From Swiss-Prot:
Substrate-recognition component of the SCF (SKP1-CUL1-F-box protein)-type E3 ubiquitin ligase complex. Promotes degradation of interleukin-22 receptor subunit IL22RA1 in resting and IL22-stimulated conditions by facilitating its ubiquitination. Functions as a cell growth suppressor. This is F-box/WD repeat-containing protein 12. It comes from the Eukaryota. It holds the Pfam family F-box-like. Ubiquitously expressed. Interacts with SKP1. Interacts with CUL1. Interacts with IL22RA1. The gene is FBXW12. One of its GO terms (biological process) is protein ubiquitination. WD repeats lie at residues 89-132, 136-174, 178-217, 222-263, 270-315, 320-367, 370-407, 416-461. One of its GO terms (cellular component) is cytosol. Pathway: Protein modification; protein ubiquitination. Residues 1-45 form the F-box domain. Keywords: Repeat, Ubl conjugation pathway, WD repeat.
Length: 464
């Protein structure tokens, strides 16, 4: 006699499965297929993999969450499986300036097959520019600015770009209208900005040279809160993937970094101090949140001589004590990088149990406890640029780019070597190097700095 579990119990069991598990159980019988195809399970899978908490049924249209998930995965795999001949590339003239690049398009989270990749850059004339990556054309530019841009971030979900200039002025642009949507002068230079979207709306967080963290609404730049975090400037400011936590680190290396509860910054109470805790490790050089374990953060700590590097991983929780909420940070793992390895500059994380970083020409993947999982030798010379997100890892060396992809569900091989793009665009008559690299599901963008101090953009897109 066949035992039929209630729908709720079966849905609970299926919630522990990954993509491949759900697809397998859906083939057992009609009952299991109906449960395995439910929007609840596929939305849960989507939330685990992407920042789509604000993606609604209205965005889906007539599509289901299963169709949405499989569509996104196909796009990810399409880039990962591409070979050099599958790309076309466009090269700009000497019109790029050495400041940040940022995607304005939300290419990753759509069900539109005709989506475009749009990148923001700054020109030598101090214009903010938006580029159609597939066409290689500039589609918008701001008026020439009086002062140089010092910082650029975007909020793709809102199609907004936010700039800071050397006059300490923040401006918000929609990259369609001529003028900025909002302008706000700041009392101090700002070293870092973070734009993010929550269930309460879009916000901008800014860390300044005085050690203060400001929170503003977007696009209007209305003041929400100001918190003094350090007595020195803030150089690192990172929101956790679920936007629940904010990591902040000051310029003074012996100051302990802090983690704030985002809600206490967005809803400040008069006379009360925002909830925060110190992470008990000094000399923090970099930090990254884990996309899959959203309350987990890994710090990279380096000695002043640069000869000793340590990775420390913490889990953050809140706890009620005596009627008050407190933040607790638990160190769950740490390890020191072997002395014979070149001191890493960049780092990234994926599933909560692995750390990826560069060392000379090598890309290394370690467990958070210090066990070497993979070593990649896809470059002959030292890696001079590195970029990581929940799907891809990019490395550059001299004038080539290598693409890696994280395996689904932390399966072996944990990080897959995919595609190597050589310098087909390179002008061999001049010296140059790649100074920035990033990608979305349909494109790879490089900024290449020439010896003359001018820069160009090289925009790869998949040939459809």
């Amino acid at each position: 006699m066949e035992i039929r579990l209630p729908d709720l119990a079966l849905k609970r069991i299926f919630s522990f499965l990954d993509l491949f598990g759900l697809l397998q159980v859906s083939q057992v019988n009609k009952h299991w297929n109906r449960i395995a195809d439910s929007d609840y399970l596929w939305r849960s899978l989507s939330l685990q993999r992407w920042d789509c908490s604000n993606f609604t049924n209205q965005h889906l249209g007539t599509h289901t969450w299963k169709q949405f998930f499989l569509h996104q995965r196909r796009k990810e795999l399409r880039l990962a499986l591409a070979q050099p001949h599958n790309f076309i590339y466009k090269v700009t003239k000497n019109i790029a300036f050495e400041t940040e690049l940022a995607y304005l398009s939300g290419n990753r989270l759509t069900v539109d097959e005709q989506e475009k990749s749009i990148i923001c850059s700054v020109s030598p004339k101090q214009e903010l520019c938006a580029w159609d990556v597939q066409e290689g054309t500039m589609i918008w530019s701001s008026p020439v600015q009086e002062f140089h841009f010092s910082n650029l971030v975007t909020l793709p979900q809102m199609h907004l770009a936010i700039t800071m200039d050397r006059k300490k002025t923040i401006k918000v642009w929609n990259c369609q209208d001529r003028d900025a949507l909002a302008v706000l002068p700041m009392p101090q230079p700002c070293y870092c900005m973070e734009a993010y979207l929550t269930k309460d709306g879009p916000f901008l967080m800014v860390g300044d040279a005085a050690g203060d963290i400001y929170t503003f609404t977007l696009p209007g730049l209305r003041d929400v809160s100001k918190v003094t975090a350090f007595q020195y400037g803030i150089v690192l400011l990172h929101c956790s993937p679920d936007k629940k936590w904010v990591f902040a680190c000051g310029t003074y290396s012996r100051t302990l970094p802090q983690v704030f509860l985002t809600e206490s910054l967005l809803r400040p109470s008069e006379g009360s101090v925002p909830l925060s805790t110190f992470l008990p490790h000094k000399l923090c050089a970099s930090a990254c949140w884990t996309p899959k374990v959203k309350n987990r953060i890994t710090l990279m700590s380096q000695s002043s001589t640069g000869k000793k590097t340590e990775f420390i991983t913490f889990d953050l929780t809140t706890k009620k004590t005596g009627g008050q909420t407190v933040i607790q940070a638990y160190e769950i793992a740490s390890f020191q990088v072997a002395a014979h390895l070149k001191c890493p500059i960049w780092m990234g994380a994926s599933d909560g149990y692995m750390i990826v970083f560069t060392s000379g020409p090598y890309l290394l993947l370690f467990s958070i406890t210090g066990f070497l999982l993979q070593r990649f030798e896809d470059h002959q010379a030292a890696i001079n640029n590195f970029w990581v997100d929940p799907c891809y890892v990019l490395t550059t060396s001299e004038n080539s780019v290598h693409v890696y992809m994280w395996e689904e569900g932390g399966r072996h091989p944990y990080l897959r070597s995919c595609c190597h793009l050589e310098n087909t665009w390179h002008d061999h008559t001049t010296d140059s190097c790649i100074s920035s690299v990033m990608c979305d599901n349909a494109s790879i963008v490089l900024r290449v700095r020439k010896v003359s101090d001018s820069s160009i953009l090289v925009m790869y897109s998949l040939n459809t």
